[in-house]
Amino acid sequence: MKKEAKSQVVSEMAQKLASCQAAFLADYRGLTVEQVNQLRGELKKVGVEYRVVKNTLLRLASKGTDAECLSEYLQGPNAIALAEEDPVGPAKVLTQFAKSNKAFELRAAELNGKLLSIDEVKALAELPSKEELLGKMLGSINAPVSNFVGVLAAVPRTFVQVLAAIQQQKEG
């Protein structure tokens, strides 16, 4: 790789590392091309970029970013998954993929500048996603309003039922 191409990769990765919320390092040795493509597709669905970058270039790109804490794990072949928004989605995909593919191994992760252990990544994968949490919160906010509307609608409904019963009583 030429020096210009390397510097372009470093600047591109530095930009992505600075803007991402979480980064996951994994050892991909032993995976087939089909398995890597499957993983890329699953990660793309949750808005995550998955790349293989040389360790030296990744080390240079991570300097001065939150992901600098991952430098100690940059040994051997590594792939990096970058999550710009919700870190729970990629954690779920990567831990599930690691369970089903023994050759794939998560090495480390970084979340907003904090180095996460593999156990912490697994715990993160157990959390509900941002969308699920927002749905639950909106449901909680909406429930009292819905109940209040139901109570307000019950008054005219029971009044109509009473009138219908009186009418039936007079007819029958």
From Swiss-Prot:
Note one Pfam family from the annotation: Ribosomal_L10
Which InterPro entries did the record assign?
Answer: Ribosomal_uL10, Ribosomal_uL10-like_sf, Ribosomal_uL10_bac, Ribosomal_uL10_bac_type, Ribosomal_uL10_CS_bac
Its BP terms in the Gene Ontology are:
translation
Record-level GO cellular component terms? large ribosomal subunit
The record's PROSITE patterns line, in alphabetical order, gives: RIBOSOMAL_L10 (PS01109)
Could you confirm whether the keyword Transmembrane appears in this record? no
Q: Which UniProt keywords apply?
A: Ribonucleoprotein, Ribosomal protein, RNA-binding, rRNA-binding
Q: How does it assemble?
A: Part of the ribosomal stalk of the 50S ribosomal subunit. The N-terminus interacts with L11 and the large rRNA to form the base of the stalk. The C-terminus forms an elongated spine to which L12 dimers bind in a sequential fashion forming a multimeric L10(L12)X complex.
Q: Which family does it belong to?
A: Belongs to the universal ribosomal protein uL10 family.
Indicate what this protein is called per its UniProt record.
Answer: Large ribosomal subunit protein uL10
Organism, scientific name: Syntrophotalea carbinolica (strain DSM 2380 / NBRC 103641 / GraBd1)
